Swiss-Prot record:
Keywords: Ribonucleoprotein, Ribosomal protein, RNA-binding, rRNA-binding. This is Small ribosomal subunit protein uS3. It comes from Methanopyrus kandleri (strain AV19 / DSM 6324 / JCM 9639 / NBRC 100938). Residues 207-227 are annotated as: Disordered. HAMAP family: Ribosomal_uS3_A. Pfam families: KH_2, Ribosomal_S3_C. Part of the 30S ribosomal subunit. It comes from the Archaea. Belongs to the universal ribosomal protein uS3 family. GO terms for cellular component: cytosolic small ribosomal subunit. Residues 24-94 form the KH type-2 domain. Binds the lower part of the 30S subunit head. One of its GO terms (molecular function) is rRNA binding. GO terms for biological process: translation.
Length: 227
């Protein structure tokens, strides 16, 4: 996606592009949060930038006769001129229970309605695992009960905390719930069903391995003869 002048250093282009994506994502979160916004993707098309927004309820995001999404397109074009002409395509999230942002927003809404934090967290955790996740962790930080702030963690399945595995295999969402006692930070981390962990071994039948070895040996012999 070419959006910057030719004289701008490459590393600065990457930084600026990252900042633009973050700001755009935050803006769409504000505008499409009620529709269950779960993230976006940028695509460069001829003479324009296409934004694919993934939401839980597309009808709410689009609005009556497309008015809401047209308004968002106009505001994005005005606020982010580097994107050029903007078109937004709204797509439905295939599995909202596996999107940490959607889950965090639902959990925050439950806390704001006065549902006990343990009941709300365990309910969210159960729905995540029932959707097929390999693992999940929910962290609630703030005034959960009483005047003193505290942190509670809820986990199930395989969870990677930090380092490269944590960054590569876990996806994260964060939302802040505003309750009467005070603000509560809601962090949801999910390991998707399709993640292949490095410590997971596949034991294959001997006959299958033997067939592959024979095929490789045959190819090696053919190459040797050809040389």
């Amino acid at each position: 996606m070419v959006m910057y002048g030719e004289n701008v250093p490459v590393h600065k282009k990457f930084v600026q592009y990252g900042m633009l994506k973050t700001e755009l994502d935050e803006y769409l979160e504000e505008e499409l949060g009620r529709a269950g916004y779960g993230g976006m993707r940028l695509q460069r098309v001829p003479n324009a930038t296409k934004i694919i927004a993934y939401v839980e309820r597309p009808a709410i995001a689009i609005g009556r006769r497309g008015r809401n999404i047209r308004r968002v397109e106009e505001e994005v074009q005005e606020r982010f001129p580097l994107l050029g002409r903007v078109s937004i395509e709204v797509k439905e999230l295939p599995s909202p229970e596996l999107n940490p942002r959607v889950v965090a927003r639902r959990l925050a809404s439950a806390l704001e309605r006065g549902i006990h934090f343990r009941r709300a967290a365990y309910g969210a955790l159960r729905r995540i695992m029932n959707a097929g996740a390999k693992g999940a962790m929910i962290i609630l930080s703030g005034k959960l009960i009483g005047a003193r702030a505290r942190t509670e963690k809820f986990m199930e399945g395989a969870v990677k905390y930090c380092g490269e595995p944590g960054d590569e295999y876990m996806i994260e969402g964060y939302v802040q719930a505003v309750t009467k006692p005070g603000a509560i930070g809601v962090t949801v981390r999910i390991m998707p069903p399709d993640v292949e962990l490095p410590d997971e071994l596949e034991i294959r039948p001997p006959e299958e391995v033997e067939d592959e070895l024979k095929e490789l040996i045959g190819k090696s012999e053919d190459e040797a003869e050809g040389a």
